[in-house]
Amino acid sequence: MKLFEIENAVDCRIIGRVNRFVVDVEVDGRRERAYINNTGRLKELIFEGNVGKCLTKRGGKLSYRLFAVSCEGGYALIDTQLQMRAFEVAIPKISWLDGEVRRNVKVGNSIIDYRIGESYVELKSAALKKGIYAMYPDCPTARGRKHLRLLEEIGKRSRALVVFVAALPSVRAFMPNREGDEELYRLIKRSKNVEFRSIQVEYLNGKVFLRNPDLKVVI
């Protein structure tokens, strides 16, 4: 199912990651710096010589925003803002979610991504691919641990979910990555009050598609 189109994408070649938010790319023979909206390490995707897709960025010091990179004959949609947009557009097709959608919901001193009906939902980017599995995280994440502990408390009185967005081609299931964060892996395994769900989306030929609204989750 097509979710939306991404117009005016620019081809690029990756030179290397500069820091958490910046990657050097080559566009039309020119060396440029592009913003990257994903705090994962993405070492399997962001490496010299790999090709990607950028959008022209308005404002700020950087001219481009890297949103997708080549992955096993297709593209990984790495931009978390676009992943969130894909999730929101896909909600009517997701049978296990229903109700009014509210974004950035305050719970105590923290913010949860969504409240959908009576469900509290936190989105996570599963951008690591190992075989048939999309995985999260690819590096230690204190933020991820904090969110899961919060959802565990919320889940005692309401429905609480973590939804992993597998924005990768040719995956058949999601699995938490023990090597990325051992403590988070243990928290997921021990969780009693949180549902773990996953959807698969894919960027192809200028469009973002919903490939699976209920991707298998292996805990």
From Swiss-Prot:
It comes from the Archaea. CDD domains: SfsA-like_archaeal. InterPro entries: SfsA, SfsA_C, SfsA_N. GO terms for molecular function: DNA binding. NCBIfam families: sfsA. Belongs to the SfsA family. This is Sugar fermentation stimulation protein homolog. It comes from Archaeoglobus fulgidus (strain ATCC 49558 / DSM 4304 / JCM 9628 / NBRC 100126 / VC-16). The gene is sfsA.
